[in-house]
């Protein structure tokens, strides 16, 4: 499989206070396309980063409406994946993908 197709399944890493705390438990959080599923994500992450994935949890964030300057604006939803790595392994997100 071509490297470009592998990277299509991972949009970006999510770096927040909560995800930073999860990284201490060998968990990494990525924003993924809505069409992504657990089996494809596991294969792609293991090929790209050369780590062993033990578990994947997927959270689907729905579209929501927000008011901006008196007008209703739709904010597009997204899907995020929480990936649990084998103990002792990690992914360095600061080096760039």
UniProtKB/Swiss-Prot annotation:
Annotated Pfam families: Ribosomal_L23 (PF00276)
Gene Ontology biological process: translation
SUPFAM superfamilies, sorted: Ribosomal proteins S24e, L23 and L15e
PROSITE patterns per UniProt: RIBOSOMAL_L23 (PS00050)
Superkingdom, taxonomy of origin: Bacteria
Keyword rRNA-binding: yes
GO molecular function, one term: rRNA binding
Disulfide bonds listed in the record: none
Cellular component GO terms, alphabetical: ribonucleoprotein complex; ribosome
Keyword Protein biosynthesis: no
Keywords: Ribonucleoprotein, Ribosomal protein, RNA-binding, rRNA-binding
Complexes and interactors: Part of the 50S ribosomal subunit. Contacts protein L29, and trigger factor when it is bound to the ribosome.
NCBIfam families on file: PRK05738.2-4
Protein role: One of the early assembly proteins it binds 23S rRNA. One of the proteins that surrounds the polypeptide exit tunnel on the outside of the ribosome. Forms the main docking site for trigger factor binding to the ribosome.
Similarity comment: Belongs to the universal ribosomal protein uL23 family.
Protein name: Large ribosomal subunit protein uL23
Organism (species): Pelagibacter ubique (strain HTCC1062)
């Amino acid at each position: 499989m071509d490297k470009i197709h592998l990277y299509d399944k991972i949009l970006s890493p999510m770096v927040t206070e909560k995800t930073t705390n999860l990284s201490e438990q060998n968990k990494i959080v990525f924003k993924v396309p809505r069409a992504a599923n657990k089996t494809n994500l596991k294969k792609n992450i293991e090929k790209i980063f050369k780590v062993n994935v033990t578990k994947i949890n997927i959270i689907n964030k729905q579209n929501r409406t927000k008011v901006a300057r008196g007008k209703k604006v739709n904010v597009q939803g997204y899907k995020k994946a929480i990936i649990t790595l084998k103990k002792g392994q990690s992914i360095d997100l600061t080096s760039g993908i």
